[in-house]
């Protein structure tokens, strides 16, 4: 049995497309130069993406900042928010449940006035068919 000196080449290799030939060449060289052919393009895409996304993110926050406005005391009263009158030194915080503005000290004293030692645990009423957790 005699082996041929020429290597076997399938008939469709001559008619292969450019992308197939480039892909085969890329895969062959990838093991020789992994950083140059894989790592460097990956890092460059990440860095280019950060430069592209920075203006988009800035535009997002600028649009949000345009929506936020400072409200004067009269406008706040018109919105239904009440604040202390004459207390310029007290910082005012918004209470979302009552929509009344009050200072932190006022809230602290209100909580201290409540009797927190005598309380009773009450079960929440469940919907029909909902398990209540009792065994």
Curated annotation (Swiss-Prot):
Protein origin, superkingdom: Eukaryota
GO cellular component: mitochondrial inner membrane
InterPro entries: Cyt_c_Oxase_assmbl_COX16
Chief site of localization: mitochondrion
Transmembrane spans: 34-54
Protein function: Required for the assembly of the mitochondrial respiratory chain complex IV (CIV), also known as cytochrome c oxidase. May participate in merging the COX1 and COX2 assembly lines.
Transit peptide, start-end: 1-22
Up-regulation conditions: Slightly induced during the mycelium to yeast transition.
Subcellular localization, as worded in the UniProt entry: Mitochondrion inner membrane
Keyword Metal-binding: no
Mitochondrion as UniProt keyword: yes
Family in the record: Belongs to the COX16 family.
Membrane topology listed for this record: Single-pass membrane protein
Protein name, per record: Cytochrome c oxidase assembly protein COX16, mitochondrial
Gene Ontology biological process terms from the UniProt entry: mitochondrial cytochrome c oxidase assembly
Keywords associated with the record: Membrane, Mitochondrion, Mitochondrion inner membrane, Transit peptide, Transmembrane, Transmembrane helix
């Amino acid at each position: 049995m005699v082996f041929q000196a020429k290597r076997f080449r399938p008939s469709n290799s001559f008619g292969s497309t450019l992308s197939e030939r480039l892909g085969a060449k890329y895969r062959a060289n990838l093991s020789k130069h992994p950083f140059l052919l894989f790592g460097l393009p990956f890092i460059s895409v990440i860095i280019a993406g950060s430069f592209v996304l920075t203006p988009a993110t800035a535009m997002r926050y600028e649009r949000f900042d345009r929506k936020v406005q400072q409200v004067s005391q009269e406008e706040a009263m018109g919105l239904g928010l009440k604040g202390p009158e004459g207390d310029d030194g007290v910082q005012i915080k918004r209470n979302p449940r009552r929509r009344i503005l009050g200072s932190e000290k006022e809230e602290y004293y209100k909580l201290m006035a409540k009797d927190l030692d005598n309380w009773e645990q009450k079960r929440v009423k469940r919907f029909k068919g909902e398990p209540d957790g009792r065994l």
